[in-house]
Amino acid sequence: MAAGSGGSGGSGGGPGPGPGGGGGPSGSGSGPGSNGGLGSGGELHPRTGRLVSLSACGRTARRQQPGQEFNHGLVLSREPLRDGRVFTVRIDRKVNSWSGSIEIGVTALDPSVLDFPSSATGLKGGSWVVSGCSVLRDGRSVLEEYGQDLDQLGEGDRVGVERTVAGELRLWVNGRDCGVAATGLPPRVWAVVDLYGKCTQITVLPPEPGFSPPTPIPTPPLEPLAPTEDSALAEQGTSADEAFMVSPAQARPETFPNSLESHNDFANMELSEVVSNTILSAYNGGLLNVNLSSPPAGEGLGSSGAATSPILTSNDALLFHEKCGTLIKLSNNNKTAERRRPLDEFNNGVVMTNRPLRDNEMFEIRIDKLVDKWSGSIEIGVTTHNPNSLEYPATMTNLQSGTIMMSGCGILTNGKGTRREYCEFSLDELQEGDHIGLTRKSNSALHFFINGIDQGVATPLTPPVVYGVVDLYGMAVKVTIVHNNNHSDRLRRNNAILRALSPEGALRRAAPAAQAEPERLLFHPNCGQKAAITHEGRTALRPHATDDFNHGVVLSSRALRDGEVFQVRIDKMVDKWAGSIEIGVTTHNPAYLQLPSTMTNLRSGTWMMTGNGVMHNGTTILDEYGHNLDRLKAGDTVGVVRREDGTLHFFVNGMTQGPAAWNVPPGVYAVVDLYGQAAQATIVDDVEVAPVPEPLPEGNNQVSPSSPSSGAGGSDLRFHQLHGSNAVITNGGRTALRHNCRSEFNDAIVISNRALRDGELFEIVIQKMVDRWSGSIEAGVTAIRPEDLEFPNTMTDIDYDTWMLSGTAIMQDGNTMRNNYGCDLDALGTGARIGMMRTAKGDLHYFINGQDQGAACSGLPPGKEVYAVVDLYGQCVQVSITNATGPMDNSLATSNTATEKSFPLHSPVAGVAHRFHSTCGKNVTLEEDGTRAVRAAGYAHGLVFSTKELRAEEVFEVKVEELDEKWAGSLRLGLTTLAPGEMGPGAGGGGPGLPPSLPELRTKTTWMVSSCEVRRDGQLQRMNYGRNLERLGVGSRVGVRRGADDTMHILVDGEDMGPAATGIAKNVWAVLDLYGPVRGVSIVSSTRLEESEGTQPPSPSSDTGSEGEEDDEGEEHGLGGQNEVGIIPTTLEFLENHGKNILLSNGNRTATRVASYNQGIVVINQPLVPQLLVQVRIDFLNRQWTSSLVLGVITCAPERLNFPASACALKRAAWLLRGRGVFHNGLKICEKFGPNLDTCPEGTILGLRLDSSGGLHLHVNGVDQGVAVPDVPQPCHALVDLYGQCEQVTIVNPEPGAASGKSAGTQGDMEKADMVDGIKESVCWGPPPAASPLKSCEYHALCSRFQELLLLPEDYFMPPPKRSLCYCESCRKLRGDEAHRRRGEPPREYALPFGWCRFNLRVNPRLEAGTLTKKWHMAYHGSNVAAVRRVLDRGELGAGTASILSCRPLKGEPGVGFEEPGENCAPPREEQPPPVLLSPSLQYAGAETLASKVQFRDPKSQRTHQAQVAFQVCVRPGSYTPGPPSAALGEPPDPHFSPAELEWVTKEKGATLLCALLVRVE
């Protein structure tokens, strides 16, 4: 080549690296030819990608067939790069057919011997490539958001790479240094350019010197930066930040004239972005080039410009202008625009930017809301009109000057079409969430972007000063301005995912240059016959995993250091084989080891974890150790570490599994066996594992998987430094609090410092609360990055990408999507722990005090990062992150959606038969009073519905009666929120909107099962669920059940197929589609007669079951009848079939667990019979473990049962009591039932009993805790799991009558007050348990919610469980309460408060409460809501002052038979207290004239109810005067009482004592 070509002026200088001759054009200076001209990297190597052709003496490269091919365009420099010289290319030509564009970098591979891959990202062996705005090393991303996005460069733009003398890689764009992209480059590298995607032709420009300092020696001070120049903020890898001030006379490259002004994309960064990127440490080593001073083009600081045009500083945020269309409403700090009345008006929705757009600045918006009413949609473009002086038109297309708009898929200039088919996308077809952007290039070309994809040049000539403009027209209602760092989730780097060849494509930090490469843990090249090592020793795989299941052994390249964790991530699995990955250590050097087919065949120096056991030299030493590796999935991690004390520990998903072996010698190599399903694994560098617990002093040192200690500690999750205005972050980011908590109740949102990983728990503990406000903490997750979140008052104000739990409501994007979730955050107090976790399936789970509450919602986007977010709202003031925060077991995290089959469920008890609704498909005929449905014609239009909503645990079941074999398909059934009556007239009419088939029923949310597929609103959710419904025959039964845990279950021939879907709404109807071969069905199920919507009412001897506070004769009620105990057989013993760690003794009546913490299941030989109490005593507890015994029943034959490691793993026919929860087939169906079994001390006697209706009762020390499980199938056997702390139990034969809570000879001498509510003090080893959900009905809960709305101090009421008692029809009948009782001396009758709910009040301790309850009479006093607090504060009725509760009426209230004093007369205080009206009948005292009604809205159901309040009081005999009723009543309120004694009046002070507040709700 000719030296000095291209006008360099130089001469001489061949292609070698030597200096050239001459100087610039005049023979002097420092022109390009002075250092060799083009001889140093100025040419491209003749060997190229297969589609590249070279021209212009090897300086121009063109990719052939650009319309058909997007890759194979790789070119390299002819010579290695010289340090400090920039290899620069110019983009000559681009096409719009593809996504992605030019990629550039360096490689250590010699092009003369290189086997060219299809793209630059396929280069390995020391290659660094900048792709888009990512830096990749050997195809793996090491730095994101670097420099300028190369995909946005246009024709004529220049890009170059430089290797500095310090071994750094720098990128140059249009003469601008983008900073350090990589460090540690080898001394000999070639430039590499990939003509990828849109880029089809480039030309090499003469090489130029770089601007980076060649050595770390301090540079002399440069002259100050001119006002119109930019400052480049260089963030070096390990040195301090330095700002290099570039002077045009000293450092600007001569061949890039005016480049700092004409091509400055980095000047577009807002100040907030600069600050955010500076403080973030995620991308150390990146370089930010920020222009904080230069104004937009055409508005510089020149002599004339400064005087004629206002200067807009570049750090002005790009927002919407305050002046806008007449229907526009701005919000979100003028970043969001919304058109008012979108269903009435379709125009007058024009908004403009607050300032002109700069060159190359992206103006991008996100569509937030659309409506379907209009045609046409959003329009976007630019205009030269200043918004301050513009009279806004109805639509921007009405402007006839200075306006360029994109409308549909065309371009309009001044209201007239100039390009009809500008791009493939039409703005009218975009959906909510899509992005639209535009930019004016420095060459005056206007480009539009849709979801990050450049649509090409819309117009080549755009005025220099233009404003962005958006027209919210037609369907478009709401948009928000977004910035570049907001949309990493959209299609900005479309090609990067498709071409990712490495499993390490996730976001990672660049490795420190100082890290020694040989020190990294790699796989040794000597591996199994069927294994291969790739990615520089980081990844091991079995290339033909489906052909063979073994010979996949790989070892580490060096020995492990003490305490060094070797951890791998499973990248790929196959489902052909059994077994999976195995991991361990060996003393054998991999260089000399002849590798076996599996490592368990090695008989020396080897420790391996396989399945859930540990093997040493091929022999099992621990059988049940930790999590089962065979259950792991792709993405899970396993690890191993040898501690200094010689103990070996394994890790699963970062969780330690405890010590597995002892006395392991030092210098062992890590070993991984890619066995069975495991096909590929990659070494994980940045290991984050929980700290290994210290060894216990003696005994088996395994750590139970359920132990809280196993989750302790080493998570890096903290609260982010960005938060709400009232929040304060302390304690190193682990504690968040709301200051001014008594004057501020919101603006205290805190968010996690990084995104949560799948299966990772983020748990906090409430540390401080105040009782000033209503409402409390709210918690959830958001996909909004903390840097992009403009913190609102509360997180429920966010209307996108946010999922929150508020109280019991699950809210998505500010809208309630589910009520009555399993926990209530408003009910939590100080010390409660709240956890959040997103599973790999995209489900969001909450944990309360470590207990999984089940899936709150599903469908969280799996590819989108989510951050934990906590709103310190209302009462909650301070929280801290707990040590339980961190990764959890994936299989445990998704256990609530397991699909294991459970035992066949019986149909509901006999009652009213189900019916089909009269609204049905047009081909359906209903017969036999709506219990039979037949499809009369065709194969579709066969929808039928249940007549009523399904209640919790209610089964709707049909039997197949007719088949038509000529059709294919299957019966479809499920649940829908669509009320059948909404579909119009029935009887086959089909209604106006009833679709022909169930998958098309999408007007309301519908869950359905077809064949073996689960769908929601027609969208596939699961495959391979249960039995295939296509195989149903005549006589087959199929049903659907809505579980109490908001799950949908399908039953086939009585067998539960497990949960098909979660998050089912409360109000759902059963729906069937008589589709295809199934032609006729008949109903075989019936609805329940008893209360089942809430939970079962209390049992006869429940702890809330008696009138104990006020009745000393309570022994007579609720203790006999069905509570009698059957005769205890003398042959009760444990079966010989039991867990492997059990040893039986004492005639098989004592069971002892002799090893480990599990494998301790025992079953009693005799099945349970009604009224037979079977009891066991806890003999011995080992405090080394956590958790304790599990109690329950199984209905399968125990003699042939193969017991699992723990009872909770029983997935068929099992009902278990564990802790305070009730479980069915491994799924929690109830919580907070009875006392916590994990805290029972030694000597506690626990019992199980079946009542006459099949309800399973739990007894603790002889006290019945109520019905745990209703309708247990029989026969069933009692089961005990000696788990965790419980190591020995013995069967106890109680004396007859023990079940009733009495012991022989003592009950008669015991005061009723000693047995109040069924639990004696001697049996309570902890705080009294809260009222169990199983022991309260819906009416009770409704009254309790109303009582809470009164905001009465809790100190007035008795603590649980003595707090309240329900007297609704169901509860009082189940207890057997009599309607009337007698009390006092002399005895007087009074009525029980049937239909009301009683809230017991504390008795004044100065009074002799025991005497009062026996000798005083019982009566009622009607009141109103406004008076309740004053009565409680006073402590009695009519305490000598004017009382609004006296029978003297209030103003505006009806008279009650007494004269009202004059208006200005003060009532007498001591001499004549106002009389108080009482009655022994609440029917009279609770009449509306005496107890006024008030309306309220139930916070749970949002329905309006009417409520009344009254007081139950003790009244001193002789202090009152009985008389006839004074209130005007239409009929006798209570015929049981004589009208002459229905009303009691007292005037004596101290004659009444408040006993209870009564509430009645209609």
Curated annotation (Swiss-Prot):
Residues 207-224 have a biased composition (Pro residues). The modification Phosphoserine is found at S502, S907. Residues 1-42 have a biased composition (Gly residues). The keyword Cell membrane does not apply. It holds the Pfam family Neuralized. It is found in: Cytoplasm, Cytoskeleton, Microtubule organizing center, Centrosome, Centriole. Residues 1-48, 207-236, 691-716, 1086-1123 are annotated as: Disordered. Gene3D superfamilies: 2.60.120.920. GO terms for molecular function: ubiquitin protein ligase activity. One of its GO terms (biological process) is spermatogenesis. Ubiquitinated; undergoes HERC2-dependent 'Lys-48' ubiquitination. This ubiquitination leads to proteasomal degradation. Residues 41-207, 317-484, 520-686, 716-884, 913-1086, 1131-1294 form the NHR domain. InterPro entries: B30.2/SPRY_sf, ConA-like_dom_sf, Neuralized, NHR_dom. Residues 1106-1115 have a biased composition (Acidic residues). Keywords: Cytoplasm, Cytoskeleton, Phosphoprotein, Repeat, Ubl conjugation, Ubl conjugation pathway. One of its GO terms (cellular component) is mitochondrion. Promotes CCP110 ubiquitination and proteasome-dependent degradation. By counteracting accumulation of CP110, maintains normal centriolar homeostasis and preventing formation of ectopic microtubular organizing centers. Interacts with CCP110; this interaction propmotes CCP110 ubiquitination and degradation via the proteasome pathway. Via its interaction with CCP110, may indirectly interact with CEP97. Interacts with the E3 ubiquitin-protein ligase HERC2 and UBE3A. May interact with MAPK6 and hence mediate MAPK6 interaction with UBE3A. Interaction with UBE3A may be indirect and mediated by HERC2. PANTHER family: NEURALIZED, NEURALIZED-LIKE PROTEIN 4. The third NHR domain (NHR 3) is required for localization to both mother and daughter centrioles. NHR 1 restricts targeting to daughter centriole. NHR 3 and 4 are required for CCP110/CEP97-binding, but not for HERC2-binding. NHR 5 and 6 are important for HERC2-binding and centrosomal localization. This is Neuralized-like protein 4. It comes from Homo sapiens (Human).
